[in-house]
């Protein structure tokens, strides 16, 4: 890959963080609106959950098939093109008149919003080695803030003009961001001589050959499944008695998650200092404990907010640590590493959404919390019994 000819200035870091957050947010505007959308289309809770699942499966497909292109093509042009195509997907969602059309729009948006995952390795490439973890932490904080603040913004806009307004406004913002990225990003040409099938094949070969990548991908998969289990069903909890909250109020709970995400930013710095295994162990322990507070959230808003803060803090902390660790493996193949890791990550998110919607329908909030705590426990045991020892030794 060509040597970067453009310094990673603070202004460019901010632009890339906002772009990353805005891109990934497009997959999550629907979550606080699921109850409203379900009533609009006369859907059950589990059927409405397919809207979120479609976005995450589209995102997973984009991670696997589109993100590796960042190691093949000039990245500024690729990033801008994908940003515009994601905006088109949201236009389809905004104008949808059926569940099938809405699923199509959200799937297309998810497919092309993986532009966020081309921006992250680009930032890692532009950053100096001693600051790479901090830069990745900042960009990833932008990503998780986008996921969480999407709910707040969606709720407020839905209160003002209905749920369709959310997607009309978001599509315009994505188009404007494409213009800003065209003006702000440096040109970054790739020197790889692999063709597209070889690029995809190398993603799988890295998975087969690298134990650390497989470890971190599995941890990310299970961690993000936890995240999706909470946020997919929370709108149903808060829209029902005893809360009976509106879309706007439900969206405000995203602010608690945003605070937790910001608190995890130092995780990249700890990874830079060789403490990634400590950060991972501590984060997974807190993730399991967060479900206790979340369970009490069915009667206590304060307990729910505390649980959201802790869960989002740990999810983001483990995620930043994972990415900082894997970017050390093959510096010349960061887009392919991202493709492999993030495909696993969002497969976990899609599975978490399906599990959450089903758990809510059959077991209510207790069922959701049981599912989340079980997966958190499995995640911790997998790390502690096997992978933790292997990575510390490495």
Regions found by a protein language model. Give the residues of each.
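Intracellular juxtamembrane helix-capping segments at the cytosolic ends
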Residues: 115-127, 317-330
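Flexible cytoplasmic inter-helical loops of multi-pass small-molecule transporters
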Residues: 182-205
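C-terminal transmembrane helical hairpin of 12-TM major facilitator-type secondary transporters
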Residues: 277-322
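Cytoplasmic helix-loop-helix junction between adjacent transmembrane helices
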Residues: 105-142
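Conserved MFS/SLC helix-loop-helix module at the cytosolic interface between two early adjacent transmembrane helices
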Residues: 61-99
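Helix-to-loop junctions at the C-terminal end of transmembrane segments
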Residues: 63-74, 262-276, 360
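Structural signature of the two symmetry-related core transmembrane helices
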Residues: 77-91, 278-292, 373
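Helix-loop-helix hairpin linking two adjacent transmembrane segments in secondary transporters
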Residues: 101, 138-185
């Amino acid at each position: 890959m060509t040597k970067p000819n453009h310094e990673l200035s603070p202004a460019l870091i901010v632009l890339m963080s906002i772009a990353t957050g805005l891109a990934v947010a497009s997959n999550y505007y629907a979550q606080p609106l699921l109850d409203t959308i379900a009533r609009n289309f006369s859907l059950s809770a589990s059927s409405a959950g397919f809207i979120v699942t479609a976005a995450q499966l589209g995102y997973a497909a984009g991670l696997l098939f589109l993100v590796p292109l960042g190691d093949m093509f000039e990245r500024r042009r690729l990033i801008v093109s994908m940003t515009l195509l994601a905006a088109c997907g949201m236009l389809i969602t905004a104008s949808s008149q059926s569940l099938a059309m809405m699923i199509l729009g959200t799937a297309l948006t998810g497919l092309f919003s993986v532009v966020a995952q081309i921006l992250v390795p680009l930032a890692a490439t532009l950053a100096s080695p001693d600051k790479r973890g901090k830069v990745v932490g900042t960009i990833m904080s932008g990503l998780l803030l986008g996921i969480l603040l999407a709910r707040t913004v969606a709720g407020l806009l839905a209160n003002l003009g209905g749920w369709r307004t959310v997607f009309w406004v978001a599509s315009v913002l994505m188009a404007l961001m494409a213009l800003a990225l065209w003006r702000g990003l440096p040109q970054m040409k790739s020197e790889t001589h692999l063709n597209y099938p070889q690029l995809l094949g190398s993603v799988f070969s890295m998975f087969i050959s690298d134990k650390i990548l497989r470890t971190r991908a599995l941890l990310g998969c299970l961690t993000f499944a936890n995240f999706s289990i909470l946020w997919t069903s929370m709108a149903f909890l808060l829209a029902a008695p005893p809360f009976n909250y509106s879309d706007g109020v439900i969206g405000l709970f995203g602010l608690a998650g945003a605070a937790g995400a910001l608190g995890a930013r130092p995780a990249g710095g700890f990874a830079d200092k060789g403490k990634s295994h400590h950060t991972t162990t501590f984060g997974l322990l807190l993730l399991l404990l967060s479900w206790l507070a979340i369970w009490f959230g069915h009667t206590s808003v304060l307990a729910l907010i505390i649980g959201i803060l802790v869960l989002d803090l740990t999810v983001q902390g483990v995620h930043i640590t994972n990415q900082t660790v894997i970017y050390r493996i093959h510096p010349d193949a960061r887009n392919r590493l991202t493709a492999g890791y993030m495909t696993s990550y969002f497969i976990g998110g899609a599975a978490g959404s399906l599990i959450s919607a089903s758990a809510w329908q059959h077991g209510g909030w207790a069922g959701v919390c049981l599912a989340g705590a079980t997966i958190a426990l499995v995640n911790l045991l997998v790390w502690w019994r096997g992978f933790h020892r292997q990575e510390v030794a490495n």
